[in-house]
């Protein structure tokens, strides 16, 4: 919607036609040489969008163009673009962006009342914000996604995300590729989880490797960042105090955009439909499936809900029943003679799990049980996150083969085989990082085999990844690699 609007805006003085398919926008323009050159020059100022994966310009000969009549009511947003940022930076001018929007945020300094940002109060609010931050005080900002408390970053990590005051500040703490830098600076200003540099991680003695970061999203925060960067402030810390909508978060993997969270940039009607439902995740799933005519296998793998393997809006094809305590777990493992012998050997060499488990019937919880066996953490959820972090940081070409399979002559998943193979590799002295990556990789092989069987029966033509478990990059990368014709939706993985 936003990119389509920009194309129409830049072509408004030309005869033009605009055509859209599901993934391609084609703009044809016609005019004299001067007008065409001016149009091409204007494209240089067009903001980069995370959703535009390719952009081509070519000359057409002897082709008539029927003028498009654009009747659409385009969505508007207070984007930071080269138009308003350059006017401020070079001339000190406060102007609207291409959508006729200035700044839609509201500020609060007293903890009680919010004041909308306007041209009249812009500089006064900017000076007050800088003054408060530099005296180690916080203030609040409100927009359509919620209320955030903002303060200087002081090495405290109980925050939701950081904002770099300038693009040059990023390298002081993070390792950022050119691709990620381009995404951060895009029109949408997404959140991206970046890896810390070794020096920064050592300075703060961090036990984690990544943190969420963004760049200023509108003119006010651009101006605020500019003033703070001049004072050698590199980052602001944001804590969300009231949630009205998820922040837009992405990552890129092998030239594919993965939208983790945030509904700000999907089809407006789809967003309204999803948000109107009590079960928003199921509404999101229904919308994803409605966009495809062919039969699809939806891989809905979650960190918070039961997993779903769904074909053509039918019943869940995955039956996964995990144990809720250690007693049940070890009883299931020892149900046959082989498992009993393995258990006796294992308990002589490793500490056994005990107590209750907080699990859902999903692969995230199963990976958490593997992580608990590896001693990554005593809590299933935390152990799962640490196992996924190990997997994502692994440099191994392949991991050990962990057993993921259904029970014999059944469509019920046999979780004991996964844990038994983990125990066997631990007894063999295999490192935790190898088992962690192997578990994620082996899960993908299980999904591939399940999918291939459906393809052979003509029940599925392609697969779609969905769900918060695909926040794990090694899982997503292997899934896209090993499952033929596997698609990524531009709808968020989870809500």
Pin down the residues of each PLM region.
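Acidic, glycine-enriched active-site microenvironments
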Residues: 1-495
């Amino acid at each position: 919607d936003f990119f389509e609007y920009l194309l129409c805006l830049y072509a408004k003085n030309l005869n033009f036609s605009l055509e859209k398919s599901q993934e391609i926008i084609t703009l044809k323009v016609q005019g004299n040489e001067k007008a065409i050159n001016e149009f091409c020059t204007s494209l240089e100022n067009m903001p980069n969008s995370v959703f535009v994966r390719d952009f081509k310009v070519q000359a057409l000969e002897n082709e008539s163009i029927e003028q498009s009549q654009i009747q659409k009511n385009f969505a508007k947003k207070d984007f930071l673009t080269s138009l308003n940022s350059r006017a401020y930076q070079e001339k000190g001018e406060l102007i609207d962006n291409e959508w006729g929007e200035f700044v839609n945020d509201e500020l609060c300094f007293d903890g009680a009342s919010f004041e909308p940002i306007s041209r009249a109060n812009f500089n006064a609010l900017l000076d007050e914000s800088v003054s408060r931050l530099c005296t180690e005080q916080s203030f609040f900002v409100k927009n359509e996604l919620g209320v955030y408390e903002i303060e200087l970053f002081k090495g405290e990590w109980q925050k939701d995300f950081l904002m770099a005051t300038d693009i040059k500040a990023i390298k002081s703490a993070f390792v950022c590729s050119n691709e990620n830098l381009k995404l951060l600076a895009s029109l949408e200003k997404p959140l991206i989880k970046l890896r810390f540099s070794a020096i920064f991680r050592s300075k703060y003695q961090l036990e984690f490797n990544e943190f969420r970061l963004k760049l200023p999203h509108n003119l006010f925060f651009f101006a605020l960042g500019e003033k703070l960067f001049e004072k050698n402030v590199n980052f602001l810390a944001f804590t969300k105090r009231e949630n009205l909508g998820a922040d837009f978060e992405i990552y890129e993997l092998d030239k594919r955009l993965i939208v983790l969270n945030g509904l700000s940039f999907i089809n407006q009607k789809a967003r309204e439909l999803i948000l109107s439902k009590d079960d928003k995740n199921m509404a999101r799933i229904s919308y994803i499936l409605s966009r495809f005519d062919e039969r699809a296998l939806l891989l809905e793998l979650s960190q918070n809900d039961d997993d779903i393997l769904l074909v053509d809006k039918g019943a869940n094809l995955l039956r996964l029943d995990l144990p809720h305590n250690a007693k049940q777990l070890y009883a299931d493992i020892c149900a046959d003679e082989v498992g009993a012998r393995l258990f006796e050997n294992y308990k002589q060499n490793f500490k056994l799990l005990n107590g209750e488990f907080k699990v859902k019937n999903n692969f995230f919880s199963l990976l958490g049980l593997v992580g608990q066996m590896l001693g990554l953490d005593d809590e299933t959820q935390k152990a799962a996150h640490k196992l996924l972090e190990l997997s994502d940081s692994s440099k191994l070409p392949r991991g050990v083969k962990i057993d993921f399979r259904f029970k014999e002559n059944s469509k019920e998943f046999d979780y004991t085989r996964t844990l038994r193979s983990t125990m066997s590799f631990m007894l063999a002295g295999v490192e935790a990082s190898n088992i962690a990556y192997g578990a994620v990789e082996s899960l993908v092989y299980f999904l591939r085999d399940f999918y291939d069987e459906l393809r052979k029966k003509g029940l599925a033509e392609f697969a779609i990844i969905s769900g918060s478990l695909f926040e794990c990059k090694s899982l997503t990368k292997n899934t896209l690699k090993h499952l033929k014709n596997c698609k990524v939706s531009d709808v968020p993985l989870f809500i």
